[in-house]
Amino acid sequence: MKETILEKIVKNKYEWIKFRKKKQPLITFKNHINTKTRNFYNSLKEKNPVFILECKKKSPSLGIIKKNFNLIDIAKIYNKYASAISVLTDEKYFDGKLEFINIVRERVSQPILCKDFFIDPFQIYLARYYNADAILLMLSILDDFQYQKLSKIAKELNMGILTEVNNTSELKRAIKLNANIIGINNRNLHDLSINLNRTRILSSLIPKNIIIISESGITKYKQIRYLSQFVNGFLIGSHLMSEKQLEIGVRSLILGENKICGLTRSCDIEIAEKYGAVYGGLIFAPSSLRKISKNTAKKIIFNNTLRNVGVFQNENIEIVKNIAEELNLYAVQLHGQEDQKYVKKLRQTLSINIQIWKAFSIDSKIPDLNWDHIHKYVLDSQFGGSNKCFNWSILKHQILENVILAGGINSNNCIKASKLNCSGLDLNSGIEVSPGIKDHKKIKSVFQKLRYY
C-alpha cells in the first residue's frame, strides 16, 4: 500500500531526531532551558474570535507558498493582529527551522506555538530551548501513552499545548486526555483534502470549558463569521502566506474587505489603516460634498498601505484614466449612469491592473450584477453619503461575494451589515463629524465590533 504524506513525514521525523540527538545532545542544553513562558492558554481566552497566525514557507500540498519569506516583515504585521503566532519548524517538508522561533519571538509580544510533528520528548526540550511557548500534539500520530508522556514534559516546562484532532475518535481521546485547547484540523491528513464541515460537526461534541480552534482551509471573512459560532478561534497559515500583500490579506480575513470612503485628510487615512480598512475611497465627483482634487489626493495618499479607489460620476473616460493612472489607483468606482458600453470603453482604455467597480443606488430591488469587466459592485442607498440605509432584507439568499455594502453604516448597525455576507462594508457618513471629516472614535468603534463579536 502506498505511503501517505503523513506517514512519510513521521518516518522522516524519526530520522531527523536521531540525527539531531547526535548533533545536539540533550545533555548539552537541558540545564540552559528557561521555563518562563508567555501564556498560550490565556492568549486564547481573549474576546472571540482569536487568531493564531502562522509563518509557513512551504507545505506538502502547495509546495513553496511564499518565495519572499521574510520573517521580520511577517512578525511586524502579525504583531498587530494575532492572539498567538505559529512557526513551522519541520525542515524537510515545510522548509522550517527551530531558529525561526526566536526571530519572530523577539519582535512580537504574543506566545509562539512551535508547529512540528512531535513524537519524542527530545523535541519538546529543544522547542523550549529555542523559546517556543507552546507545542502542537497531533493525536493522528500519537497514542494515549505517548501523548501523556509528551504533555507531561510540556507542562513541566510551562508550555501550552494545542491538541490536534481530525475525527470523532481522536476527539474523544483528546477530551479523555484532558486537553484544554483542541484544534480541529479541517484537512484530511492522508489525502490533504479540506472539509470545513468537520469544524461544525466535531465542535458540537466538545465541552464548553475547552478552547476550540479551527485549523486549515480558512480563506474568507465569511467563513470566519460562520464558524465563529462554533469555535473560539482559528489557526491560519497557507492562505495568508500566499497573499502578495500580507497585511491587506490579514485585514481582509479578520475584518472583511472594508472601505472608508470620502477621505479628504491624511490623518483620516492613517486611522483607517490603523484599525484595519482595506480600501480608501477618494471622491472626484464634482457634485459630492467630499470631492477632492487630484493634487490633494496625491498628497494625502502618499506612502499609505490602503488600496485606493477613485469614485467618479458620469466622467469623461480620458479624465478617469488620467487620474487613475497618475495616482496608481487600485480601482475606479463608477457612481453615475454609466452603462455597459461606457464600462467596455473604459476597460479598453484603462491600465489592466486597475479594477472597475460599479455602484448602484438601491430602491426596492437588486440590479443585474453580471456586467462584463466589473470586479465589484457597491450597493448604496438612493442618495450616497446621506447616512441612510436601503432595505437590506432584499439581499437575503443572494450571492454577495463580490459586493460591498454601502449606505448609512455605522457602529450601531455594522454587525448586522456584516452578517449579510458581502465581501465588505463601505463606511462614509456614518463615521463622520461632518462631510469629509472622519470621526476617529467612530472608526475605532466600528472596527472593534467587526473584530470581536
From Swiss-Prot:
EC number: 4.1.1.48, 5.3.1.24
PROSITE patterns assigned: IGPS
Keyword Amino-acid biosynthesis applies: yes
Sorted UniProt keywords: Amino-acid biosynthesis, Aromatic amino acid biosynthesis, Decarboxylase, Isomerase, Lyase, Multifunctional enzyme, Tryptophan biosynthesis
Domain of life (superkingdom): Bacteria
Catalytic activity: N-(5-phospho-beta-D-ribosyl)anthranilate = 1-(2-carboxyphenylamino)-1-deoxy-D-ribulose 5-phosphate; 1-(2-carboxyphenylamino)-1-deoxy-D-ribulose 5-phosphate + H(+) = (1S,2R)-1-C-(indol-3-yl)glycerol 3-phosphate + CO2 + H2O
Region ranges (Indole-3-glycerol phosphate synthase): 1-257
An example molecular function term from Gene Ontology annotations: phosphoribosylanthranilate isomerase activity
Pathway in which the depicted protein is active: Amino-acid biosynthesis; L-tryptophan biosynthesis; L-tryptophan from chorismate: step 3/5; Amino-acid biosynthesis; L-tryptophan biosynthesis; L-tryptophan from chorismate: step 4/5
Residues covered by region (N-(5'-phosphoribosyl)anthranilate isomerase): 258-453
BP GO terms, sorted: L-tryptophan biosynthetic process
InterPro entries, per database record: Aldolase_TIM, Indole-3-glycerol_P_synth, Indole-3-glycerol_P_synth_dom, Indole-3-GlycerolPSynthase_CS, PRAI_dom, RibuloseP-bd_barrel
Sequence similarity: In the N-terminal section; belongs to the TrpC family. In the C-terminal section; belongs to the TrpF family.
Entries under NCBIfam families matching the protein: PRK09427.1
Annotated HAMAP family: IGPS_B, PRAI
Name of the protein this chain belongs to: Tryptophan biosynthesis protein TrpCF
